[in-house]
Amino acid sequence: MWYASLMSAHHLRVGIDVGTHSVGLATLRVDDHGTPIELLSALSHIHDSGVGKEGKKDHDTRKKLSGIARRARRLLHHRRTQLQQLDEVLRDLGFPIPTPGEFLDLNEQTDPYRVWRVRARLVEEKLPEELRGPAISMAVRHIARHRGWRNPYSKVESLLSPAEESPFMKALRERILATTGEVLDDGITPGQAMAQVALTHNISMRGPEGILGKLHQSDNANEIRKICARQGVSPDVCKQLLRAVFKADSPRGSAVSRVAPDPLPGQGSFRRAPKCDPEFQRFRIISIVANLRISETKGENRPLTADERRHVVTFLTEDSQADLTWVDVAEKLGVHRRDLRGTAVHTDDGERSAARPPIDATDRIMRQTKISSLKTWWEEADSEQRGAMIRYLYEDPTDSECAEIIAELPEEDQAKLDSLHLPAGRAAYSRESLTALSDHMLATTDDLHEARKRLFGVDDSWAPPAEAINAPVGNPSVDRTLKIVGRYLSAVESMWGTPEVIHVEHVRDGFTSERMADERDKANRRRYNDNQEAMKKIQRDYGKEGYISRGDIVRLDALELQGCACLYCGTTIGYHTCQLDHIVPQAGPGSNNRRGNLVAVCERCNRSKSNTPFAVWAQKCGIPHVGVKEAIGRVRGWRKQTPNTSSEDLTRLKKEVIARLRRTQEDPEIDERSMESVAWMANELHHRIAAAYPETTVMVYRGSITAAARKAAGIDSRINLIGEKGRKDRIDRRHHAVDASVVALMEASVAKTLAERSSLRGEQRLTGKEQTWKQYTGSTVGAREHFEMWRGHMLHLTELFNERLAEDKVYVTQNIRLRLSDGNAHTVNPSKLVSHRLGDGLTVQQIDRACTPALWCALTREKDFDEKNGLPAREDRAIRVHGHEIKSSDYIQVFSKRKKTDSDRDETPFGAIAVRGGFVEIGPSIHHARIYRVEGKKPVYAMLRVFTHDLLSQRHGDLFSAVIPPQSISMRCAEPKLRKAITTGNATYLGWVVVGDELEINVDSFTKYAIGRFLEDFPNTTRWRICGYDTNSKLTLKPIVLAAEGLENPSSAVNEIVELKGWRVAINVLTKVHPTVVRRDALGRPRYSSRSNLPTSWTIE
């Protein structure tokens, strides 16, 4: 902290650049005039957006895959527990549990359909007393293991009464009729049906092609009732059996006990309300409306009166389906949009509306649901009933009235309930507090801050506790970013003190999942292809040569969409005679260049309208056929022109254009907040950082600001990154740190000027006006002076950044995974094991591929086992595995990936485990690799790849020093020389590495093969990242600084190493140059010691 006190005389500014798979971080020290003095820290942190190798294809996150594995484990555990409880119930009721091999008729022991025959006989005839109990047990236990489907919202009590034959049972009848031609009797049970079919036909019963298919639990419950009736079992005992067989515990509501209490004084007995609760939706709308102010003639801003508030709240809540704008709100209040202030102000809880007014999101979801019966109920229910239903669906399954309503829904509608995605998260207060605050704000002119003071007696400094910066939100990609930002800011504060300014910039997909970002990329590619086709059409059909601008493409699109008619007057226009016009102009410099504000018009209308809103001009222009009603009619006649244009996109565009045509006020001019992001997660991050650093100025900008800033300052040609000068080249990952440094120096006035420049640029390129936007530096003298001063600061920043680059202190970091993670064995179809007769002899390779460690131990402990040749053939051989004797005539099973026709005697051992009667490979689930030096006259180096499976039993200890026994799959897959050295104590354990570790390598001696050719193009590439362990003796490395996305026409060697396989290097070759394993702290500095037992850097000696 001595350094922090020394720095306190200066000013710290932190910049954060959030991307989809990266976070750029930078800390600057500036003087009193804002001139950068020192670049204290600059790094690019690369992350995987929460998606591992197993989920890369479908963009499935680790969280999703681990959730599937966790639920699979819980399901199996729960199923075992339920079956054990069923056995106890059967014993208590006097039904003995049949032991293996015991059966009604010894002649039927090998009959695969015997349990189906028993179920059929129990329904058709009354069995003797001595057979009745075991038979009922067998049938009930079989049904319990295949009990069928039941809607999770229906209770087990619904099965206690007889039910009609389900649609699943009717479908079974149809399948049997189509397959066998047999017509089943009415009232037949599933057991009878299968026994009848199995007796007479050779068909598959289960599986994807099986005839049994899916059954409803009511069908099996009907069979149990018939069995009990036929065998003389009392109704009470029958009901006990039904409850035990079909018992189910719903997980809904299990997390309510962990919800935090209301933080307001006196409200601690209430839990925080879910954000999907209608009461929170109402509170959010009212609290944002309470922030609104109306600018009056004297320059003062007054709050809305109580009547005005109620008027606006009613307007916003009466129709959640409407796409309202703040212009609509202003018109409802009878004021100009420019006089309505406070639309972008945060409430005291950090809530902030986006570009549009707030709506009741829950109400919109319920009114748009495809569950028609629930939608109808919602529209007829009152507010109290709606709130109860939302709580029932979200967290509280105890409401009996709601349960009855859900139970009455058609079964197909009940099945859709799980697809109903309500707003997630928790409000800061309880439902009771939300109601009190909403009612108070609606009845007075108090905002949320004043309402809290009056109702709960808190002072001006009180605020609800905010989440920690790195607290997870549930989205793996966002959680990665939050954790990185939280750790970095904590390290900056610890090292240099509290920053005065923290600026965050994020790309559009920076706070979304990888799947969403990929879908948006696909949409962008489709749009790009459409634009390419439009450019070809303009050149081919209209004879335009040279550069084709975006304005040309938009003009063609508008012309075709409008049917070659001027939108304003209907006159026929052509490509060369039409002009683009902004329906609603923007106050100040620039224009709103969104597609919904651009239409093709004739020269006469464009010249006459000038910079006037269409609705105002249409009333007084005097041109025939010009009017709001006529223009809207033309818009409603639009039809989509390209295959890639969806009907939803066209409907959205038409709705936006119609709204613009009706508007009578010009768009407000760009202000200093115009470039601040309004994305939900950006607001949340802003709120968390501001709560953690209350004295710090925090702003969150859109990504376009940084791009405009780099170009305006001209720094792309001055930064010494790898790649082409004069443009942002993505081949060098350190460009994220550049962006973070740029956004750290951003100021509100400069952001406003940059936004105005971008708006002018778009307007001039679309309309073909003279390109003057590059000379624009501000609308006032002060703004221009400030902009020029900022340019000077940016040039000085480039010098500081280049100094850090020259010193190799702009770091590229990446987190490493040290804890045990789930594999994908539960999702992979097992491969078949290969059988070998024990007496025929086995090679060492076959023994190392033994399907279990116990089998390997038994084989290698034979007296005639040879480490090179394995076991010779011997007819008197006998081994014991898990207490069972295996003789020479018996068969043992081993892993093998070869075809049945190929010999596996020399097949190399590989990572696999036995599951579900087969085996699955576990190659991707290597936890870490241990580096050993094998001592001798000339020491050699080797590595032991440690599979996660071999560490499960030691998951609560030190995984990197855990003993790896000889029978483990890790040791069996290691190099023979290493296995022997470890056994004889001749191997020295030097340290461990994991995927993601950084290696600093002296590459001067690597001049051959692909790596040599790569280094000719990119010399002095000394920092590499471990990407995998290709074999038991080779590492796969890729350069840390270089990114594949920036490659353009690379050589084959560069393409192979950067984008494809990487540099595959033998561990014994690599260790000869004694590389250093570099572990870094949150600021990117190498860590050589740690009091918290964090991984430290070390050199392979």
From Swiss-Prot:
List of residues binding Mn(2+) 1: 17, 736
Residues binding Mg(2+) 1: 581, 606
Active site: 17, 582
GO BP: defense response to virus
Sequence segments annotated as region (RuvC-II): 468-513
Region (Disordered): 253-273
Highest rank taxon of the organism: Bacteria
Chain segments carrying region RuvC-I: 1-64
Record's description of how this protein is used: The simplicity of the Cas9-gRNAs RNA-directed DNA endonuclease activity may be used to target and modify a DNA sequence of interest.
Domain comment (free text): Has 2 endonuclease domains. The discontinuous RuvC-like domain cleaves the target DNA noncomplementary to crRNA while the HNH nuclease domain cleaves the target DNA complementary to crRNA.
Protein name: CRISPR-associated endonuclease Cas9
Species for this entry: Actinomyces naeslundii (strain ATCC 12104 / DSM 43013 / CCUG 2238 / JCM 8349 / NCTC 10301 / Howell 279)
Lineage of source species: Bacteria, Bacillati, Actinomycetota, Actinomycetes, Actinomycetales
Encoding gene (name): cas9
